[in-house]
């Protein structure tokens, strides 16, 4: 265990790829994302699009992992279902969402970050800044802890 799993849809999936690489390369923390076309199409075909991320978590997550789920609206059913699966598995979950303050994803994680906006670009860029800031914080802790 002890890796970070990052998932999102569309622009949030691109962000998941970027931040997973940053966690691994810059912060020295093993991180993966679920953006492989064969994984998405196989699991979505076999389990339904709303369930493919939770099924990927079942297959790839280990005890002690941290799951980061990103959805601008906070209403993406595959992200919500993944949050519930992560909870069942005892994994720590961080969610990143926007739009309505009471969106379902925001209610589903251990740590929930919400952007008070209804503009996709503002929400996505804020999520990106926050996620990169987490990596920078970890790097700072590593570099300055000695």
Each model region followed by its residue ranges:
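Glycine-rich phosphate-binding loops that contact phosphosugars or nucleotide phosphates
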Residues: 5-144
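Glycine-rich phosphate/diphosphate-binding loops that line cofactor/substrate pockets in enzymes
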Residues: 1-2
């Amino acid at each position: 265990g002890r890796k970070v799993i990052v998932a999102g849809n569309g622009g949030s999936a691109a962000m998941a790829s970027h931040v997973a690489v940053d966690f691994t390369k810059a912060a020295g923390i093993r991180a993966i994302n679920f953006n492989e076309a064969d994984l998405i199409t196989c699991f979505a075909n076999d389990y339904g699009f709303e369930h493919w991320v939770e099924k990927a978590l079942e297959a790839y997550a280990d005890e002690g992992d941290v799951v980061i789920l990103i959805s601008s609206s906070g209403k993406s059913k595959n992200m919500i279902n993944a949050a519930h699966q992560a909870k069942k598995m005892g994994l720590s979950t961080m969610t990143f969402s926007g739009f309505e303050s009471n969106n379902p994803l925001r209610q589903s994680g251990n740590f929930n970050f919400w952007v008070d906006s209804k503009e996709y670009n503002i929400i996505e860029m804020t999520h990106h800044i926050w996620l990169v800031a987490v990596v920078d914080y970890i790097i700072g802790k590593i570099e300055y802890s000695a």
